[in-house]
Regions:
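An edge-strand/N-cap motif at the start of beta-rich repeat modules
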Residues: 49-80, 85-88, 106, 415-416, ...
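Acidic, Ser/Thr/Gly/Pro-rich low-complexity segments and short DxT(G/T)-type signature motifs
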Residues: 18, 25-51
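Short glycine/serine- and acidic-residue-enriched loop/turn motifs that recur at repeat junctions
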Residues: 55-75, 107-125, 156-174, 208-228, ...
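Extracellular beta-sheet repeat scaffolds used for adhesion and glycan interaction
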Residues: 1-13, 235-237
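Thr-biased low-complexity repeat/linker tracts and other Thr-enriched repetitive architectures
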Residues: 76-86, 125-133, 149-153, 200-204, ...
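Conserved core positions of repeat-based scaffolds
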Residues: 57, 94-97, 106, 143-146, ...
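Acidic glycine-/aspartate-rich tracts in secreted/extracellular proteins
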Residues: 15-16, 28-32, 37, 60-63, ...
Length: 432
């Protein structure tokens, strides 16, 4: 509930159906005026209003991942057919997206069975995944982890590191349920070999590769190189929701409900944000979670060897590897130097501005929206990732044309292998 001047607004905690009638009620005494007098409990009837949402895509398209029914590359946005899209998650050259009717659609590279359609076939336009009870899908390298509305966990596609969580390395091209638990509420699949997930009780679970201690189990000596079933990390206050979990092939990060941010794994380029970094010869590792300073962290998304995160005050921060300018600091280093290891930043550095809203990342590219509906991008741009109609890398934010881009973290939901995403392409939502 939000109160502003003489207006009171209520925000649903879950999506509203466009076909249902809802009744809103509150008991007597719950709401009072400034004199302390209670308003009489009452009820209101309303129908949710669903606006049209369009998907726009650009970048690499070798597997049809832009949904254009072709394999042509685009360095400026092109629309994917349809106006009832709700949100999107990307993987390595493929995508899954939800529509308003809760159907899920796939397009792009179907290698390793990534489509979940019982085939290793690529699709250059959206095709439907069976079922309407999916609530969360997150993607990594040619594979997916998903949660249904009943709290069950599912997986399919690439599984060489045990990322299904079913205690096997078998790869399947259609969804398989992982265990019998019905309390999963968020899942984050990243890189080629790791998954993190939370349950409704606030616990955090991880599985997959453990080579760099990125599972946070206080094991970094290689004794156990991978876990193919979920293992719990200490604590019961881990946050869930869009962009609360992050990571890449060698490190992980997560936000707690108190706004603190924690990281673990490899720290070669300062990606753990602890104001210390290793060198090529002696990389520093932390095999259990360590806190990054601050208590107002809101969302986080990882690039290849670094992180991008927002705070509750609308500021945007970046740290780690900066070879392509992905930290937004107006500097980059295409060649290493002895005194400046790819211009890495081992502690959070602020990107100018205080109205940043949602974030998404690829391997070395960053996208972000502001509260005014503008959309910005920077970093790697070889395949037109920045949608600025050229392929020059940018080390500070550049605006993508338009002011009607959807704000809120669900707009650029996950760019996995990044966040909602792939390494070389982007899908974004407009509201019409």
């Amino acid at each position: 509930v939000t109160i502003s001047d003489n207006s009171l607004s209520m925000t649903p905690t879950s999506d509203l159906s466009e076909t249902k009638i809802y009744h809103l009620s509150y008991p007597s005494g719950v709401i009072t005026n400034m004199a302390g007098e209670s308003y009489v409990g009452t009820a209101y009837t309303f129908k949710s209003i669903v606006v049209n949402r369009e998907f726009w895509a650009w970048g690499k398209n070798n597997k049809g991942q832009l949904g254009q029914n072709n394999t042509t590359y685009y360095s400026s946005p092109v629309q994917i057919p349809g106006t009832t899209w709700k949100n999107v998650s990307f993987g390595t050259n493929f995508n899954f997206a939800f529509k308003n009717d809760n159907t899920v659609w796939f397009w792009g590279d179907g290698g390793y069975g990534a489509s979940g359609l019982n085939a290793e076939v690529s699709y250059s336009s959206p095709v439907q995944l069976p079922g309407t009870t999916w609530s969360r899908i997150d993607l990594g390298y040619h594979g997916a982890s998903a949660i249904k509305t009943d709290g069950t966990l599912w997986a399919w596609g690439y599984n060489a590191q045990g990322t299904y969580g079913d205690n096997s390395l078998t790869e399947l091209s259609s969804p398989i349920q992982i265990g019998s638990d019905t309390t999963w509420n968020d899942v984050n699949k990243y890189g080629t070999g790791n998954v993190s997930a939370t349950k409704t009780d606030g616990t955090l679970w991880m599985w997959g590769s453990n080579d760099e201690g990125m599972l946070g189990l206080n094991q970094s000596d290689g004794t156990v190189s991978k876990y193919s079933s979920p293992v719990q990390l200490p604590g019961t206050t881990w946050a869930s929701g869009n962009k609360k979990l992050a990571g890449w092939n060698s490190f992980s990060a997560a936000i707690k409900t108190d706004g603190t941010l924690w990281a673990w794994g490899r720290n070669r380029f300062g990606q753990l944000g602890l104001n210390q970094a290793g060198s090529p010869a002696t990389p520093v590792r932390y095999s259990s979670p360590v806190q990054i300073p601050g208590t107002t962290w809101k969302n986080i998304s990882s690039v290849q060897y670094g992180n991008i995160a927002t705070k509750t005050d609308g500021t945007l921060w970046a740290w780690g590897w900066n070879y392509w300018g992905q930290l937004g600091q107006n500097e980059h280093s295409y060649e290493p130097s002895p005194d400046n290891w790819f211009k890495s930043k081992s502690s959070p550095c602020q990107i100018p501005g205080t109205t940043w809203d949602a974030i998404a990342t690829g391997a070395n590219t960053v996208w972000a929206t502001k509260t005014d509906g503008t959309f910005w991008a920077w970093g790697y741009n070889t395949f037109g990732n920045l949608a600025n109609n050229n392929r020059a890398h940018m080390s500070s934010p550049v605006q993508i044309p338009g002011t009607d881009w959807i704000t809120g973290q669900s707009a650029i939901d996950r760019w996995k292998n990044g966040g909602s995403s792939s390494v070389y392409h982007t899908v974004m939502i407009k509201e019409t």
